[in-house]
């Protein structure tokens, strides 16, 4: 018998009152006795903490917290510890005699939350001699020890050999180890399991009936039937998967046409685009090559045109240069002609103005003389008028003074003053300081004589001035003429220079007369020179065009050679057109033949594709139509044979399925009716009783019972006799055996065992001999073995049936394919390959194109040579008439010589024209230049001085005359005399005044008349001078203009200039005509070059674009080809017949397929997205990706194990066949998987019966338990009424609710929930789903109601409630229930842990003083019978008779608390034995 594990001891380290204390635990009851606060609860708390180190659960209440909603913040643990490291350890020994120490390290965490840190650990392999306190403490001296930390403990244990130390980071791992080693009774996998365990310990600790446990006794006592639930879940999952698969199969079958449509349209969509890109790539390559050929041709043409353009541009540049010089010459000639005409007009004007100037010069000289005489006379008249005016003024002054003196007394004084003033003025003017009035008359005569002398001298000088002025005028005129001709010079050199000028003028006139003959001669030579230069230019141009220099003598021979070449080239050019026409005709014939073959090629390719498909499908090669028809007959025969074999395999497969279904019945009943009869009779099938028989014993028992192996074992046959009457729904032979199903054996028969057989003595006169069956089916193991072999056979048959079905369908499809081929393609399939002929004709066409290009090139060169020869002949025709000019080498020198002479003559003509008139005027007056009349200036000065002397003498005489006249004023004798004297004087003065005024009037009249005449003369002179100056200035301007013109205006100059201009105009017109021709030709050439350049740029751009497109397309095409080859779809996409369709047709085909595909994949998000991406024309590989995605989608939908061909249509047809097979197989599988509602009810009922029996066995162990008035305790298990109704309906009335269980939309759990709602509409299901409710209904525990009952006194059996029991009775009843829970846990966990381990059993009971002695004895008896350990706490007045008792006393010594512990074993009269681990000094001397 397996020995149960036990707790050996509890060790507390550094707890409040316990520094290092180990409590040895009794094998039955350990009592902690002591007063209040002695440490009993602390000790139990340490035990519970080591057992369940979960701070979320631990809560050590005390009686002061009764009714409180929450305890202290630390839940009672923080205050039970001391500062520092604390330990609580349990020393255990399990059924395997392994010592295991488990415990926790505790430590207070600083802070107001009063938290505690817990670390669980375990120690294995510790020797029995080592005490727990020795592990975690270190002795410092006799009275001091130190607690080791967890790390130090680990290091210490690592040093001990064979000892294993484990520290746990999770409570789950800690409890898992304790469960595996048999320390706790149940595996605590989750926090919920730990909570149940803690509530059980808590209920045990505080005693009484725990409502938390009694309310959920099902969770504590009834094991979870996880196997059944998992079986149901697996069944539902399998059914769900089966139904989903069936639904997918139905959808796939309904989508077959869609798949075909999808494959067809996807193939058209992608293959059309694939072939269009392939065609475009080939077309682009051809276009790129054509562009390159055309590019090279255009470059050659452009180079030729550029050479031609350079030649023409050079010639045009020469003509432009010549035209520029000709235009300059022509413009110069025109300007020269204009200048000559202008010079002639200027010369006429100059001559006219010179004649006018000579006439004006004469008139001006005459008018000068008249004006000079008038001016002299005017001066005299002015002098006389002035003198007369002065005299009148003097006389009037004297007469006024005199009148004034007469009027005033001071007259004489005034007169005297006036006389004195006159005397002073006379002294001043006459320079006579000694002048007196008396001597004034004498001096007057002297000065009047001097005045007369000065006047005479002045008249003499005036005559001399007139003569000198005439001589001076002639010299100046002659000098000015010389200076005008020669320039500035000294007056002394005038005579010599004038004679030299006159001699030079004669020479210049002689040279000027030679201008016209020289000009004519020069014009003639220049014309010949220009013709010579033109001939040289033509020769140079000709040589340049010919690329060779020619002598003059070679030109005539060259002319004849070129004419001969022209004749030969003309014949070659005319014959080239006929050859070109023949080549073009052959090219057109080839093109027509190629077009015809291209139209026939798609039909032939379609026939070849069909023929190749047939060859691949049947593995035969066909070379004629007769072979095709013969093979078709073979197919028909093969199809008939395959159909026969398929039907045979199908019949055998159905038989195997029926046998498997029969053997798969629950309980081994081959007939479903047997289960119903067994339930009806209250019996058990014999096969169910022997369901656990081994495979080795199955043949024996099968032979033993023979036909009665399907019998029903009933407790009493007499009780079912009445039920047999009228029984019809049963097998033909129904065997009934009387016996106890719980203890049935094979002793009902007398049997003799033979070799592989038995003899059963049914009666004295009836024996049965049965051999051991080769394939026994009695017992679950035998049936499973047989079913396994049948399944293997069925798999082989299914595979063979599927293969044969495939073969039949394949043969049928092959027959249809041959029929279609014969009807559509047989007539063209075996004709010659048109593509090979097309390739041969294309090669010939390329040769013809190359020949045409060569011919065109040769013809073009011949035409170019022909044109060059014609141009050479034309140039020679212009050049040959001028050969004599080319030979004249002295022409240029003669032109230069004549030009020099002409320049000299023109210079002389200009000199004569400019200075001829001056020389003509100088010649008659040149003699006056011999003497220079320079004294004329001196004479003018003398004349001016004499004129001033004569004026001064006149003033002096007048002043003296005034003094003489005023001599009387110097002395007056008296006033009378003065008045008479004044009267005379006044009369004289008046007479003189009258004479003076008359003289003044005459002088004024003469002055006025002479002034008017002088003014008239002056005006005439001014007019003449102005006219002279104007004409002189105009003449000078005309002469300057003539000089600026720089031409000599003679009679022949205009004619020569006009002739030169006309010649240059003709040359310019010819040059312009040629230039225009060259410009037109150059413009045409430039246009041609521009067209060629534009064409070349376009060709280069097109070529580069095309090449780039080709390169890009090549990279993309390589990616496409790589993708196509990697995915193996090249054969499907490369449809050669599409190569003969145009790009528009292929694009239209692709677009139509795209429209159909958009509708087809509208409901598939993945394909819709891939299709949308594939519409990008720049990314052709995405269409391949779409095609691959379609096939991948079809593979996923069709199942890859079905697709046995690369052809998608065949794959779908094979899929259809396989789907029909799968549908049949899955339908039968669903029938096998689907458990009936009756079976479910039976399983749940049997499980309930089993658990009721188990509870009944547990009740037997509690019948003898009694506490106070409680005589017995039991558990009452009942089936809920609503659930019992559900089980009845499931068993008997399932046909009424088949709408739920046969629905494919509902799982079995959901159908069960719907049925429960239908039967109990009054129950509110809340927010729970039918699936959740159904899963709960599949758990048998939800069908049961459990309650604890007690047999108390006279009340009988009552429901155990705290209110109906005393405290002690409640504690005992609760402890009984807990013992039952622990035992139930052990039974449930026995299958989880090793069978050689019996776990520890330990419960707590705090405050056991509420129990009386009889109740405590009952606890002792219960612990002994159940091998359970119990720790109870009681005050000092309670002492049990058995077990181990610890007396705890808390003492205080020097502010330090410690608990004094004394351990006693039993209550015997002898001295108690001191227990290990206690202090001897604490043991009392006697028991009390």
From Swiss-Prot:
Organism domain of life: Bacteria
Domain notes: The hinge domain, which separates the large intramolecular coiled coil regions, allows the homodimerization, forming a V-shaped homodimer.
Any GO molecular function: DNA binding
Subunit structure: Homodimerization via its hinge domain. Binds to DNA via its C-terminal region. Interacts, and probably forms a ternary complex, with MukE and MukF via its C-terminal region. The complex formation is stimulated by calcium or magnesium. Interacts with tubulin-related protein FtsZ.
Function comment: Plays a central role in chromosome condensation, segregation and cell cycle progression. Functions as a homodimer, which is essential for chromosome partition. Involved in negative DNA supercoiling in vivo, and by this means organize and compact chromosomes. May achieve or facilitate chromosome segregation by condensation DNA from both sides of a centrally located replisome during cell division.
Annotated organism of origin: Salmonella paratyphi B (strain ATCC BAA-1250 / SPB7)
Name of the protein in its database record: Chromosome partition protein MukB
Family that this chain belongs to: Belongs to the SMC family. MukB subfamily.
Single Gene Ontology BP annotation: chromosome segregation
Keyword Ribonucleoprotein: no
Residue positions binding ATP: 34-41
Protein keywords: ATP-binding, Cell cycle, Cell division, Chromosome partition, Coiled coil, Cytoplasm, DNA condensation, DNA-binding, Nucleotide-binding
